[in-house]
Amino acid sequence: MILVPSLLPLVVDLKVHKRQSFSIFLFFLFVLICSDLCADRPGPPQIEKEAIKTPGMSYGEAVVYGFVEGVTEFLPVSSTGHLILVSEMMPSRNQGKEMEQAINAYIIVIQAGAILAVALIYRRELWSILLGILGLDPRGKRLGVNLIIAFCPAALIGPFLDDLIESLLFGLLPIAIALFAGALLMHWAESRKKKARDGVENPEKSLEDLNFKSSLFIGFMQCFAMWPGTSRSMMTIVGGYLVGLERAKAAEFSFLLGLITLTAAAGYKGMTKWEVMSSNLELGPVFLGCLVAGASAAVSVVWLVGYLSRRGLGIFVWYRLILSMVIFCIYYSS
């Protein structure tokens, strides 16, 4: 069985996507470079002040974290992977093992801002689901059931793998591998989608038309995103492609499923890591980062739905390939 398709279509699409993907790559590279400038620089060493405990994360760092989280959370490029990359450049990262654990927890908790943004954008769908729970909206009930089914695999597997993933996969090499592999998967899924649209196929499904098997399949696809650099959004959108959802509907199901999954992940991480976070991070920067994440996520979500309807995933394939190559070079040259 051939798992990796020919890369010839990538070469054909190069003229279409190269300029856009390279511009996005340069933009995020600019954020990475400037993130260090946004952080508070320590002054000259002063023996008298070393004994005074200072906040572990500055407001400048919080803004950078929030912006990167909001922009990348719902794009198929891995927000966690980007946040880990950014955190490696932050001064607060080099303040001991406990601070590193606090930052790793904050990288998950900051998703609360992005969650709120999507909840506001899809408030009608959420209201329909609520009415469905009350037995007043059959359409909303079917959608809610599908989302719960898709959430179950991550809910059952996630808590058991959380510590193992953080200890083994929160690094440059695992992120680079996941970015590269994800690019190949997206290219294959997009090529398959185009062939299906050009040929004879069954009508594409609506969100309410998903059955138990399709919803569960998307849920298991989401579990692969526990590996940083993979992207929860990418795996669920690709899963939607494979069960017959059109591009925009696959993205919308990914966003709605993300509301449940990200809320659970942020809540779980907040409860289990609250002590280390509260003792190392001030509330001001934490809340500021969440607000920035919410504002940038709102723009990102609206843009992505429109873009996918017109262009598909091609630009993100190129972005992930370029970024993975850069990270590989950084890792093996250090």
Residue ranges and their predicted role:
Residues 2-334:
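Multi-pass membrane proteins that catalyze or facilitate reactions on polyprenyl-/lipid-phosphate substrates
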